[in-house]
């Protein structure tokens, strides 16, 4: 079977020219040249979303126009009058199939236009790449896939009568008083076609290339042309075997050093016996070799251990245990400078304030018969008078006198109803005392007898009421509360760390007055001891070493 010979290209493909004679007898030659041919396009379809997903022909077609003037008898000597010629030009583009199709016997079904976008372009006079007129089509799209050509039709609107065609009728002058239809005419000059290009479907579209140099030159001169600086080509053919395996291996190799080269800061530590102590210390961060541990929280009757264990500093000067009264055992540490010990004691103060929801710890003020604990109570969230965890016995009371003072306490204190304190957890802990737990004997910290009320024994030694005591200018009023804890020598008082204006004010106090100035108090406050003489007086020692007394609260 004989093959069909290839179709010969049309005569007006890529470049075409035509000439005409004007009324003045001049020859005008029009020359069109498709400088940038369309190469590919993606079919946009005819659905509802076709206009939104429309892809223009790539690269955008560019057609150059040149106009020459010459003598009718001499075609050799031509003058380029493209910029000097006074006329309007526009180019209209249509879509044609590259292969002509035979007409069927039946009537063809009506179809909608296949070419969409902006098929009309006006002339733009540019200096580059050469001085000429250019028609640019940056927004042309094709709906269906196939092989097509673009056909460009040039139309001219003459402005001067001398440039009209030789056979054109002479226009009659318009009357000024009678309006008439505008008599402007468009003349078809010539047609040029592009080379065939392919329109692909969405699945077969190879992608877009970078913008050509001609598109960049035109865009630099102010024309509307889309510029792409990267290649958007789709990879065709079989997939390489290492396309995805390489990425997986690379990511796998990248994860291995991250996991094994750098040690994990939160890895499981070396197995060691756990301690139930509130402040268990890691052996790697201990302050001395084989520092003895303090008794655990269960031995002191605490219900919850501390959430974050911290290092426990050693006591500055632990008192040696006597035969009559045992004292708590403090951790043994090597001798260090006093400044370093004071720094550790100050840093350890913050470790004594966990969350204030620790019930079950009886207060010595409400339950005088509870078992003594060397730890401070955890009901105060921020107590400035808290010292180190192991506090020595009060120096004002001999240890041998404490057992005998238990019998001097005649009656229990009445329940407390009104407390002037800023911590709400103190009210709950003191209003509802919990019976003390049975303490388990321990070799590390033997229990001590409770500190009972000394109102009967020291009533003669303290005749003045609390209001007549010489107050310290830096003393902080705490309301009707009792603090049985002693101060360590390295503990800074609260007044050294906080200013005078930060003290809470009670009972009509003012920031510029003393804690309990006797001159500014009412007569009822001055004679409180006389009016309330039948109540018990409680004596306690403050953090700065001063002895003070308190009257039991009213029922």
From Swiss-Prot:
<feature type="compositionally biased region" description="Polar residues">
    <location>
        <begin position="380"/>
        <end position="389"/>
    </location>
</feature>
<comment type="similarity">
    <text>Belongs to the velvet family. VeA subfamily.</text>
</comment>
<feature type="region of interest" description="Disordered">
    <location>
        <begin position="234"/>
        <end position="533"/>
    </location>
</feature>
<dbReference type="InterPro" id="IPR038491">
    <property type="entry name" value="Velvet_dom_sf"/>
</dbReference>
<keyword id="KW-0804">Transcription</keyword>
<dbReference type="InterPro" id="IPR037525">
    <property type="entry name" value="Velvet_dom"/>
</dbReference>
<feature type="region of interest" description="Disordered">
    <location>
        <begin position="39"/>
        <end position="60"/>
    </location>
</feature>
<feature type="region of interest" description="Disordered">
    <location>
        <begin position="1"/>
        <end position="23"/>
    </location>
</feature>
<feature type="domain" description="Velvet">
    <location>
        <begin position="25"/>
        <end position="228"/>
    </location>
</feature>
<dbReference type="GO" id="GO:0005737">
    <property type="term" value="C:cytoplasm"/>
</dbReference>
<feature type="region of interest" description="PEST">
    <location>
        <begin position="439"/>
        <end position="479"/>
    </location>
</feature>
<keyword id="KW-0805">Transcription regulation</keyword>
<comment type="subunit">
    <text>Component of the heterotrimeric velvet complex composed of laeA, veA and velB; VeA acting as a bridging protein between laeA and velB.</text>
</comment>
<dbReference type="GO" id="GO:0005634">
    <property type="term" value="C:nucleus"/>
</dbReference>
<comment type="function">
    <text>Component of the velvet transcription factor complex that controls sexual/asexual developmental ratio in response to light, promoting sexual development in the darkness while stimulating asexual sporulation under illumination. The velvet complex hat acts as a global regulator for secondary metabolite gene expression. Increases spore dispersing capacity by impacting conidiophore architecture.</text>
</comment>
<feature type="compositionally biased region" description="Basic and acidic residues">
    <location>
        <begin position="13"/>
        <end position="23"/>
    </location>
</feature>
<feature type="compositionally biased region" description="Basic and acidic residues">
    <location>
        <begin position="492"/>
        <end position="503"/>
    </location>
</feature>
<feature type="compositionally biased region" description="Polar residues">
    <location>
        <begin position="336"/>
        <end position="372"/>
    </location>
</feature>
<dbReference type="InterPro" id="IPR021740">
    <property type="entry name" value="Velvet"/>
</dbReference>
<feature type="compositionally biased region" description="Basic and acidic residues">
    <location>
        <begin position="519"/>
        <end position="533"/>
    </location>
</feature>
<keyword id="KW-0539">Nucleus</keyword>
<protein>
    <recommendedName>
        <fullName>Developmental and secondary metabolism regulator veA</fullName>
    </recommendedName>
</protein>
<keyword id="KW-0963">Cytoplasm</keyword>
<feature type="compositionally biased region" description="Basic and acidic residues">
    <location>
        <begin position="239"/>
        <end position="258"/>
    </location>
</feature>
<feature type="short sequence motif" description="Nuclear localization signal">
    <location>
        <begin position="39"/>
        <end position="44"/>
    </location>
</feature>
<feature type="compositionally biased region" description="Pro residues">
    <location>
        <begin position="311"/>
        <end position="331"/>
    </location>
</feature>
<dbReference type="Pfam" id="PF11754">
    <property type="entry name" value="Velvet"/>
</dbReference>
